[in-house]
C-alpha cells in the first residue's frame, strides 16, 4: 500500500464528520451558557475556557471529552479558587446530571452530559507563565498557543496521535509515560507534518533540545537551566514549553516509549500500513505452552485493592512488582519479567516470570569477620561453619518452595510494596503456573513478550 | 582430661625416642661424610649444612626428612652454583642410591637413603641477610637463629606443630597457606611455650606485628617498609624474619588458617583433648544422602593431568575450579562450593556443588542502546526484543542442561583454567550427582563441609 493511500484511509477514520463537529459545537455552546449562568448565580467573576484537544480541534473522531476550565481572576486567594471553584463545578455538574469529585493537585468535578465526559477544573486566568500558580493553569496558554500556531495542520496532529496510540506510545499518564497530545501538536508545528515528524525520529533524539518558541534566545538563563536540569535527569528529549521556559513538555516521556516511536517510525516509512494506526488485536495464545517453550515459571499474586484511581494504583502495583523482583532475586530466584494490572473491579494482580519455583534447602549465609565479638557468636551459634578469607560462613536452612518463600518474605516485611497495598498483598492468593481464565490472555501476552515487545 | 595429661600423652607420641635420635645422628654423620668427600672429588669448595627441623631438633617423631644444603662461597657466580651444585647433588645422590631432580627456584636433587628422603640443595654460604641471593639461602641463617634462641623449648615447638597439623593449619606450601615450621619456632621463642602461644591467639592477631629480633629498632626504615607492604596486602600477621628485616615469615599464612588456629586454640584451652592433635579420621558418610538433605547437586569433572608436582598442579586445579565458579554463575548456576584434588596417579578432579542442573531454555540477553548502529542491528536480528530504559533486550535460546552448558563453555574457551590444564579439561568426563567409588568419601567430606568446616 502506498503511503498516500494509507494516510487517506486513516484520515477517513479519525477526522470527525461534519455531524460530529456540529454536535461538539452545540455541546460547547450549551456548556458555556450553563457555566456563565451558574457563575453569575454564585456571584463569581469566573471566565469559562475550553481547553484540550476539543478546543484545539485536534481530537480524534469519537473521542470528544470536554475540558472546561473555570478561570478565576489572578488576585483571588488560592483557597478561594479551590473551594468556590469546586462549588461552582458542583453547581454546573448538578445542572448537567450525574457528576463525581476527582482528585488531582486540587479537587475538581467530573460530570457527564449527553454521554460526553466533562471535566470542570478551577484555575487562574493567567496571561503568561509568570502568572502560573497551579499545575493546570498552563492549559489555557497551551490551547491559545496551539491555535495560534497550528496553521490548519490539525489533521497532521490527528495522524500523529493515532499513530502513537497504535504503537502504544501515546499518553502522558505517569503509568504510561508516552507522548502527550500537546507534545504531538508541538512536534507537528515544529517539523511541519506527520510524515516529517516520523522522518526526524533519529534527528530529534540527537538534537535533544526542541525550542519552538525560541526561549533560549528570549530567556536564555531560565531556558538553559531547564535544559541542564532535564539533561542531567537523562530525559530523552527536552522540549521547552512554548508558553513556559521553565518546563520540559516531554518531562514524562520515557526512553522506552521514545524507542517504540523510533523503530516504528522507521518501519512505517519503509512499509506503510494501516496496522501501525489500528493494530489488529492479537489472537492470543496458550500461556502454558509458552511456559513449556521457555522452560520458565509464572507465579501470580491476586489480591483485593482499595478504591483507587489508576493513576494511583498502577504505580503502586509496579512498585510492588519491583519489590518482589528485588526480594526474590536476593533469595536466588531470577525474575525474568513482571506484569501488573487490575483483575475485575476489586482485585489486582502481579505476575512474575521466574527461572524456577524450587531452590536448594540450604543457603550459604555470610557472617561477620571471625576475630570479632559477633564472629565468635556466629561461630558458637552455627553448626556448619567455615572461613573464606577473614569472613565466617555458615549453612542456613531455607524454605525451598516459591510459595513458602513469598509468604515468608511478606510476613517478614521484606518486600517493598506500594504504600496502600501493604496489607492487602499479604493476604494475596498465590498461583503457580496457573491463572484463572480471565487472565489467560494477559498471561500469554506477558510471557510471549507481545505486551512490551517492539515487534508486535 | 586435664591439660597436663593431654600434653604428656601427646609428647609421648611426638618426641623422638633415643633410638630414633641415634639413628638420625648416625645418618647425619654419614651424609656429611659423603657430601664432603664428593665435594672434594669434584674440586668444589662447598660446605655442607644441615637445615630444617632435623638440624633444629624440632622434628616430630618418625618425620625425619633431611635437608642438606650445599653452600658455595659468596664469590661463586650464580650460574656455577646452579650447575655445579646440581652436579654435586647428583654425585651424592648416586652414592646414596636412587634420586631424582626436583624443581624449585633452582633445580635440586631429591634422594632416598636408608628409607629417608634427603634433599640436596645448592645455595650460598651467607653470613647475614645482606648476602642473600637465592630464596633458599636464608635457611642456614634460620637454623642458626633458632638453635641460638630456642633455649631447650624444642618440645614446645613439637607440641605446636602437632597441634597445627591436627587442626589442619600446618604447612607453608602455596596450596596450604598454613603455619610453617619456622613460624612455629618463632612463636614459641617469642611467647614462651605451646600453651602461651595458644593463649595469645587473639592478642597476636591484634598486635599484628611480631618482631622477635628487634628489627624495628635496628633497621627501622627497612623493617617499616616490610610492615607497610604486608599490611597493605592485608596479611593476618607480619612476623619480621629475625634473620632478614625485608621478609614477613608469615607472608603465606592465610586468614582461613589463622582463623582455624584462632578458634581451635580457644576450644583446646577450654576443653583440652587429644583429638586436637590426632583427630580421629571421619568415618565418612553417604554423599548422595548429603545431596538429598541439602537439595543441591554435584558435578564432577575427571580429566588426565600432565606430570606435575603438587606445588604446581594444585594451584592450577584451584584456578580452574574458580574459573568454573565464575563462568557458571554468569550462566545462572550458583556454585555453593568447589573441591579439587588428584584422582589416582594420572587424573585429577574438580567437584562443584550447584544449586541446580537445569535452567530455563531462554535467557534475557541485554543488547546495546537502541539509537546506535549496533542497536538497529540488534533490533533487526532478534525476534523478541524490547526496551528497558534506553537499552534493548532480547530473548536468547540457551542450553538448559548443565553438561551441555559446561561443554559449550569449554568449547568457547569461556572458563579460566590453569595454564597446563587447558587442553585436558576440555576432554573431561562430566559426572552429575555421581562419583566413582574411590571419590565417594571425598565427595561426602566436601558436601558436608567436613573438609573445610571449622567444627570438624
Curated annotation (Swiss-Prot), chains A, B:
GO terms for biological process: RNA repair; tRNA 3'-terminal CCA addition. Keywords: ATP-binding, Magnesium, Metal-binding, Nucleotide-binding, Nucleotidyltransferase, RNA repair, RNA-binding, Transferase, tRNA processing. GO terms for molecular function: ATP binding; CCA tRNA nucleotidyltransferase activity; magnesium ion binding; tRNA binding. Mg(2+) binds at residues 65, 67, 119. It is an enzyme of class 2 (transferase). ATP binds at residues 53, 56, 142, 161, 170. InterPro entries: CAA_C, CCA-adding_arc, CCA_tRNA_nucleotrans_2, NT_2-5OAS_ClassI-CCAase, NT_sf, NuclTrfase_I-like_C, Polymerase_NTP_transf_dom, tRNA_NucTransf2. Pfam families: CAA_C, NTP_transf_2, tRNA_NucTransf2. Its EC number is 2.7.7.72. Gene3D superfamilies: Archaeal tRNA CCA-adding enzyme catalytic domain (3.30.70.1550), Beta Polymerase, domain 2 (3.30.460.10), CCA tRNA nucleotidyltransferase, domain 2 (1.10.1410.30), Poly(A) polymerase predicted RNA binding domain (3.30.70.590). It catalyses: a tRNA precursor + 2 CTP + ATP = a tRNA with a 3' CCA end + 3 diphosphate; a tRNA with a 3' CCA end + 2 CTP + ATP = a tRNA with a 3' CCACCA end + 3 diphosphate. Its cofactor is Mg(2+). Transmembrane segments: none annotated. CTP binds at residues 53, 56, 142, 161, 170. CDD domains: NT_2-5OAS_ClassI-CCAase. A single active site specifically recognizes both ATP and CTP and is responsible for their addition. Catalyzes the addition and repair of the essential 3'-terminal CCA sequence in tRNAs without using a nucleic acid template. Adds these three nucleotides in the order of C, C, and A to the tRNA nucleotide-73, using CTP and ATP as substrates and producing inorganic pyrophosphate. tRNA 3'-terminal CCA addition is required both for tRNA processing and repair. Also involved in tRNA surveillance by mediating tandem CCA addition to generate a CCACCA at the 3' terminus of unstable tRNAs. While stable tRNAs receive only 3'-terminal CCA, unstable tRNAs are marked with CCACCA and rapidly degraded. Belongs to the tRNA nucleotidyltransferase/poly(A) polymerase family. Archaeal CCA-adding enzyme subfamily. Homodimer. This is CCA-adding enzyme. The gene is cca.
Amino acid at each position: 500500500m502506498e503511503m498516500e493511500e494509507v494516510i487517506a484511509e486513516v484520515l477517513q477514520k479519525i477526522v470527525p464528520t461534519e455531524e460530529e463537529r456540529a454536535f461538539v459545537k452545540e455541546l460547547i455552546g450549551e456548556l458555556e451558557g450553563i457555566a456563565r449562568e451558574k457563575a453569575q448565580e454564585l456571584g463569581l467573576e469566573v471566565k469559562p475556557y475550553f481547553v484540550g484537544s476539543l478546543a484545539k480541534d485536534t481530537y480524534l473522531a469519537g473521542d470528544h471529552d470536554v475540558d472546561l476550565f473555570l478561570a478565576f481572576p489572578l488576585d483571588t486567594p488560592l483557597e478561594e479558587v479551590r473551594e468556590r471553584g469546586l462549588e461552582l463545578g458542583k453547581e454546573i455538574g448538578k445542572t448537567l446530571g450525574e457528576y463525581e469529585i476527582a482528585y488531582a493537585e486540587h479537587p475538581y468535578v467530573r460530570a457527564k452530559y449527553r454521554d460526553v465526559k466533562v471535566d470542570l477544573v478551577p484555575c487562574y486566568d493567567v496571561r503568561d507563565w509568570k502568572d502560573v500558580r497551579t499545575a493546570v493553569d498552563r492549559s489555557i496558554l497551551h490551547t491559545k498557543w496551539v491555535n495560534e500556531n497550528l496553521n490548519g495542520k490539525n489533521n497532521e496532529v490527528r495522524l500523529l496521535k493515532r499513530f502513537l496510540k497504535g504503537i502504544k506510545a501515546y499518553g502522558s499518564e505517569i503509568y504510561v509515560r508516552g507522548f502527550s497530545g500537546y507534545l504531538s501538536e508541538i512536534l507537528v508545528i515544529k517539523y511541519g507534518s506527520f510524515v516529517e515528524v516520523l522522518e526526524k525520529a533519529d534527528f530529534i533524539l540527537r538534537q535533544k533540545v526542541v525550542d519552538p518558541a525560541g526561549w533560549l534566545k528570549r530567556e536564555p538563563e531560565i531556558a538553559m537551566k531547564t535544559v541542564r536540569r532535564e539533561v542531567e535527569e537523562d530525559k530523552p528529549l527536552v522540549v521547552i514549553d512554548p508558553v513556559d521556559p521553565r518546563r520540559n513538555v516531554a518531562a514524562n516521556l520515557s526512553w522506552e516509549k521514545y524507542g517504540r516511536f523510533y523503530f516504528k517510525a522507521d518501519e512505517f516509512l519503509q512499509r506503510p500500513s494501516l496496522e501501525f494506526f489500528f493494530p489488529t488485536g492479537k489472537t492470543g495464545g496458550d500461556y502454558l505452552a509458552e511456559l513449556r517453550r521457555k522452560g520458565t515459571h509464572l507465579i501470580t499474586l491476586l489480591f483485593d485493592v482499595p478504591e483507587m484511581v489508576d493513576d494511583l494504583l498502577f504505580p503502586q502495583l509496579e512498585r510492588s512488582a519491583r519489590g518482589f523482583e528485588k526480594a526474590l532475586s536476593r533469595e536466588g530466584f531470577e525474575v525474568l519479567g513482571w506484569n501488573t494490572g487490575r483483575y475485575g473491579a476489586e482485585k489486582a494482580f502481579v505476575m512474575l516470570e521466574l527461572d524456577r519455583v524450587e531452590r536448594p534447602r540450604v543457603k550459604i549465609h555470610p557472617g561477620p569477620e571471625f576475630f570479632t565479638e559477633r564472629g565468635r557468636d556466629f561461630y558458637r551459634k552455627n553448626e556448619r561453619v567455615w572461613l573464606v578469607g577473614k569472613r565466617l560462613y555458615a549453612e542456613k536452612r531455607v524454605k525451598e518452595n516459591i510459595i513458602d518463600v513469598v509468604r515468608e518474605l511478606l510476613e517478614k516485611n521484606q518486600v517493598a510494596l506500594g504504600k496502600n497495598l501493604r496489607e492487602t498483598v499479604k493476604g494475596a492468593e498465590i498461583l503457580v503456573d496457573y491463572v484463572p481464565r480471565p487472565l489467560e490472555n494477559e498471561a500469554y501476552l506477558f510471557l510471549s513478550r507481545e505486551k512490551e515487545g517492539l515487534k508486535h
